């Protein structure tokens, strides 16, 4: 997925397997997304933005891990809200492409 190594994805998912253990910074670093080009980050955004609205909404964030591996757990409500708050720089309740890119590189 996203041109990432399968072993890195597996390790990153394993590290946040327990409920409420997801940390976006640690996850992006572990899967190798932090080092990806702007083009690759945009491709990832477009996949996560399932309804193609140009934004990643709360419901799409909740299923974030499943974009990396089918059958991965959904994020808890608490994790989803923390993730959304971290990425939603303008406070509109959703994450745009620029906000997502900043979140990945943070």
From Swiss-Prot:
Xref: InterPro entries: EF-hand-dom_pair, EF_Hand_1_Ca_BS, EF_hand_dom, Parvalbumin
Domain of life of the source: Eukaryota
Segments forming a coiled coil: none
Entry-annotated residues carrying N-acetylalanine: 1
Domain EF-hand positions: 36-71, 75-106
Keyword Ribonucleoprotein: no
Binding of Ca(2+) 1, residues: 49, 51, 53, 55, 57, 60
Any one annotated GO CC term: cytoplasm
Molecular-function GO term, any one: calcium ion binding
Binding-site list for Ca(2+) 2: 88, 90, 92, 94, 99
Keyword flag Ribosomal protein: no
Gene3D superfamilies, per the entry: EF-hand
Assigned keywords, A-Z: Acetylation, Calcium, Metal-binding, Muscle protein, Repeat
Summary of the function given for this chain in its UniProt record: In muscle, parvalbumin is thought to be involved in relaxation after contraction. It binds two calcium ions.
Family the UniProt entry places it in: Belongs to the parvalbumin family.
Protein name, per record: Parvalbumin beta
Organism expressing this protein natively: Squalius cephalus
């Amino acid at each position: 997925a996203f041109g990432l190594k399968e072993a890195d994805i597996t390790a990153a998912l394993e590290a946040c397997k327990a409920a409420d253990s997801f940390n976006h910074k640690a996850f992006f670093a572990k899967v190798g997304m932090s080092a990806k080009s702007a083009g690759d980050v945009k491709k990832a955004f477009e996949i996560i933005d399932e309804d193609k609205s140009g934004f990643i909404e709360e419901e799409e964030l909740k299923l974030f891990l499943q974009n990396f591996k089918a059958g991965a757990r959904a994020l808890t409500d608490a994790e989803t809200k923390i993730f959304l708050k971290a990425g939603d720089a303008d406070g509109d309740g959703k994450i745009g492409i620029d906000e997502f890119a900043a979140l990945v590189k943070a």
